[in-house]
């Protein structure tokens, strides 16, 4: 594993902002980056499944679950789907489950916490909308870089 965010900060400090959320690592791939795709949902991961069913080459899904850890928005089945569709990673402002299995998967996964409970499946949620989490904006088509050191956002793809 390679640390990427310190190098990015050293080379591009004026082009990045820190996404200052207390997220934990759950996937085997600890360092990952890509173009941001967003989902906003609450206790319903239908849109997460829809998005992860698409080609995710070079992309990271950022899910705003409103910070709730009552129901998991990502589990092992959706993580497998993400891997099958070439996603770089999934960042969840909410809960995940099946963490023992996901810790063995070659996917970047960060989340606020865990819950053993599954979500509702009502088709609710919004895709590719601007998210605001802890007063910080996350916009689709921006770029996100994540590792053990933190999470950075940039308007452009950075070389490092």
From Swiss-Prot:
PANTHER family: 4-HYDROXY-4-METHYL-2-OXOGLUTARATE ALDOLASE 3-RELATED
Binding site residues for substrate: 75-78, 97
Source species: Vibrio vulnificus (strain YJ016)
Record's function text: Catalyzes the aldol cleavage of 4-hydroxy-4-methyl-2-oxoglutarate (HMG) into 2 molecules of pyruvate. Also contains a secondary oxaloacetate (OAA) decarboxylase activity due to the common pyruvate enolate transition state formed following C-C bond cleavage in the retro-aldol and decarboxylation reactions.
EC id: 4.1.3.17, 4.1.1.112
Assembly and interaction partners: Homotrimer.
Superkingdom assignment: Bacteria
Keywords attached to this entry: Lyase, Metal-binding
UniProt-recorded name of the protein: Putative 4-hydroxy-4-methyl-2-oxoglutarate aldolase
